[in-house]
Structure formats: C-alpha cells, structure tokens
C-alpha cells in the first residue's frame, strides 16, 4: 500500500510598505490575530523614509518573492511637504502621482493605498459612512475618539492583549 502525500497549497505572501508606526501596529495585530496570513511589513523598524526611498523599496519587493505588495501612504504628510516645498521645484505630491502611475502601469502585483488624510480615516469608516473631507488627521482622530472609547495613537493602545485595534475593528469589516 503506497503512502498518500498531501499536496501543499502555497500560501500567498504579502509585503506592506508603510511610512508610519500606526500602520505597522495595525498590521502586526492583523498578523497576530489572523495566523493563516503570510505578510511582511517593511521597513521592520519604523524610520522616516522619503517617498523616493519607499518607491524604490516597493519596486524591489514587487520583483522579489512576494505575490502582492501594498504601499500605504498618508496623503496629509505628502500635502504638508508639498506646501513647504520651494516654488519652482517638483512637489512631493507631483512625484507621488508619477510614482503611482508608474506602479499601476508597470507592476501588476503592486497596490497603492492612499489614506486621505490618514489611516485613522479608514478606522472611522468602520463605524460610519462618511464622505466628509478632513484637512488634518487630528480632525479625524477627534471624531474617532467618540466611537472608539479611549482611542490614542500609541503602541500600548494598538497592541493591548485581547483588545487590540484589529479586534476592535474586525466586527465592522
């Protein structure tokens, strides 16, 4: 009698390129709570990287072992940097849209996710439908605090054992 071999189904692998700690904390909780998901968060150690560095990392990851690469960008940061840019110089916003266009045209396994203005707006959408425009992340955070009791933008809040940010938002997905 021959042995039966179980055919292994490959688990898709995902890489996330993020520019802030909030995104890293959320994704770490996703990974902790959804064990079947194979994802990597880049950079592993949060450091303020410019758009050019993030873009280069996205391109490198897209041509490596990952099935899908997600680049999560907070638009409020890009707009702030664009407003502070000297006149006559290409703004970070213009550069970002060029990068986004390149990625959508050339790399099919890359998804650019733009938070407008920040990730907290996406959290807010878990609780209520709104098309309201928020200029600043602080405006969104104020609204979010009404719906997520005790919300604070800290690692301690995001990673609480048995009540982390992912578990609080999951029922509203």
Residue ranges, per PLM feature:
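C-terminal accessory helical subdomains adjacent to catalytic cores in phosphodiester-
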Residues: 2-11, 24-25, 29-43, 57-68, ...
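Catalytic nucleophile-elbow at a beta strand-turn-alpha helix junction centered on a G-D-S/GDSL motif
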Residues: 15-25
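Conserved beta-strand segments of the P-loop GTPase G domain that flank and frequently precede/overlap
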Residues: 17, 71-74
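Eukaryotic endosomal/vacuolar membrane-trafficking regulators centered on PX-domain-mediated PI3P pathways
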Residues: 47-53
